[in-house]
């Protein structure tokens, strides 16, 4: 789950991490009131969307008076911001962050992720702050400093100093401030079950202060059950509606660009199914794993999600019956197809427990359901059916 910048900074303040004074607003008049509360004669207006690259897309603007402020907020609210991290439709702008300006002398990058190779949290720092860190990692990986944290003892102050001096910094007062910031970020990361934390940029002001000018936070979805405060921060308007619907039924769904819908039980089998569709000349429209308990209700909801994608011209169902019986799965598929009213061809491959009985039920259903003879046959059949429609 992703957070907006204003939500991320709200968390940073709870951990005594310095951020600029700011207010989130939902209309132009509130922006003027926020500016008066913040003070000063210039402000930064930031569109709140779950995507990077806002500045280049016009989503971050410097305003020099309250008339410009009101105009900028009015121009951004209700629009869809398209950045290099969004699709062509962009993300809806429903909130604006009005923030005080900062006297920037230097921009740094600071981040933390879970490294799957070492199975530990890794903190990263770079002198290349304020730019797309992905490009830095690709073109100049030597400019990214890393420290790996031993979970038995946690982040240690000497590791913070290691990053500090690695950035070419020397001032002792700044070192104490930097250490406090990194230690605070580590506590935030571990206590709130984060999967990604980025401060980009971490700025050094003209007076030598360190301030977190922008913040990006991703939370581990698997831990949301114990993070009730963060769970309430979810903004479903920033998420794909199909994926949101799938989460309600504990279905693992990711929308893709093809026209062949996929419903599979098991993530590995789902990936193999998409590979075989591509190998057979087709394009999968989604990844959808219904999990081990492919009940009638979940199968029905899975079909609803798949057919809600208007690009879908056919559906491939690939089920391996281990504990669950294939004949019961067949009953669920037939019932779901009737209930949802699917008018595109459906190819079903059943393998495992009672697979032959399940295939017979599908064949006897008098519906537009094709029982495949095997994995490869299933992929070839659905590609053929979709090709006929096209």
From Swiss-Prot:
Alphabetized UniProt keyword annotations: ATP-binding, Ligase, Magnesium, Metal-binding, Nucleotide-binding, Tricarboxylic acid cycle
A Pfam family per the record: Ligase_CoA
Positions contributing to Mg(2+) binding: 200, 214
Names of the cofactor(s): Mg(2+)
Record carries keyword Magnesium: yes
UniProt: substrate binding residues: 265, 322-324
Domain (ATP-grasp): residue spans on this chain: 9-245
UniProt pathway annotation: Carbohydrate metabolism; tricarboxylic acid cycle; succinate from succinyl-CoA (ligase route): step 1/1
Highest taxon in the source lineage: Bacteria
PROSITE patterns linked: ATP_GRASP, SUCCINYL_COA_LIG_3
Membrane spanning stretches: none
Catalytic activity reported: succinate + ATP + CoA = succinyl-CoA + ADP + phosphate; GTP + succinate + CoA = succinyl-CoA + GDP + phosphate
Residues reported to bind ATP: 46, 53-55, 99, 102, 107
Molecular function via GO: ATP binding; magnesium ion binding; succinate-CoA ligase (ADP-forming) activity; succinate-CoA ligase (GDP-forming) activity
GO BP term, example: succinyl-CoA metabolic process
EC number: 6.2.1.5
Details of cofactor binding: Binds 1 Mg(2+) ion per subunit.
GO cellular component: cytosol; succinate-CoA ligase complex
Summary of subunit composition and partner proteins: Heterotetramer of two alpha and two beta subunits.
Function: Succinyl-CoA synthetase functions in the citric acid cycle (TCA), coupling the hydrolysis of succinyl-CoA to the synthesis of either ATP or GTP and thus represents the only step of substrate-level phosphorylation in the TCA. The beta subunit provides nucleotide specificity of the enzyme and binds the substrate succinate, while the binding sites for coenzyme A and phosphate are found in the alpha subunit.
Similarity section: Belongs to the succinate/malate CoA ligase beta subunit family.
Annotated protein name in UniProt: Succinate--CoA ligase [ADP-forming] subunit beta
Gene: sucC
């Amino acid at each position: 789950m992703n957070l907006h910048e204003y939500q991320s900074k709200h968390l940073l303040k709870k951990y005594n991490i310095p951020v600029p004074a700011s207010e989130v607003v939902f209309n132009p008049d509130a922006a003027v009131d926020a500016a008066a509360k913040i003070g000063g004669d210039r402000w930064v207006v930031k569109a709140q969307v779950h995507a990077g690259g806002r500045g280049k897309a016009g989503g971050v603007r410097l305003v020099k008076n309250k008339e410009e402020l009101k105009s900028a907020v009015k121009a951004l609210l209700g629009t869809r911001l398209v950045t290099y991290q969004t699709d062509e439709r962009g993300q809806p702008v429903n909130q604006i962050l009005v923030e005080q300006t900062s006297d920037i002398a230097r921009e740094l990058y600071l981040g933390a992720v879970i490294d799957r190779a070492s199975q530990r949290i890794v903190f990263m720092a770079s002198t290349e702050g304020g730019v797309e860190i992905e490009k830095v990692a690709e073109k100049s990986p030597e400019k990214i400093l890393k420290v790996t944290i031993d979970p038995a003892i946690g982040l240690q102050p000497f590791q913070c100093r290691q990053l500090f001096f690695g950035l070419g910094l020397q001032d002792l007062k700044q070192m104490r401030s930097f250490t406090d910031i990194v230690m605070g970020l580590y506590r935030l990361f571990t206590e709130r079950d984060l999967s990604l934390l980025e401060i980009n940029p971490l700025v050094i002001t003209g007076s030598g202060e360190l301030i977190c000018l922008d913040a990006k936070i991703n939370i581990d979805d698997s831990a949301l059950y114990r993070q009730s405060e963060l769970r309430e921060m979810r903004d479903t308007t920033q998420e794909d509606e199909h994926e949101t619907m799938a989460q309600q039924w504990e279905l693992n769904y990711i929308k893709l660009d093809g026209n062949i819908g996929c419903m599979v039980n098991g993530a590995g089998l789902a990936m193999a199914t998409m590979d075989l569709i591509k190998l057979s000349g087709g394009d999968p429209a989604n990844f959808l794993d219904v999990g081990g308990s492919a009940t009638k209700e979940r199968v029905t909801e899975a079909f609803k999600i798949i057919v809600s994608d208007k690009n879908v011209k056919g559906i491939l169902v690939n089920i391996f019956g281990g504990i669950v019986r294939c004949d019961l799965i067949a009953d669920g598929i037939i019932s779901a197809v009737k209930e949802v009213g699917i008018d595109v061809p459906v190819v079903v491959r059943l393998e495992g427990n009672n697979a032959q009985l399940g295939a017979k039920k599908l064949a006897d259903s008098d519906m537009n359901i094709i029982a495949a003879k095997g994995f490869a046959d299933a992929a070839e059949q659905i590609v053929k059916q979709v090709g006929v429609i096209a």
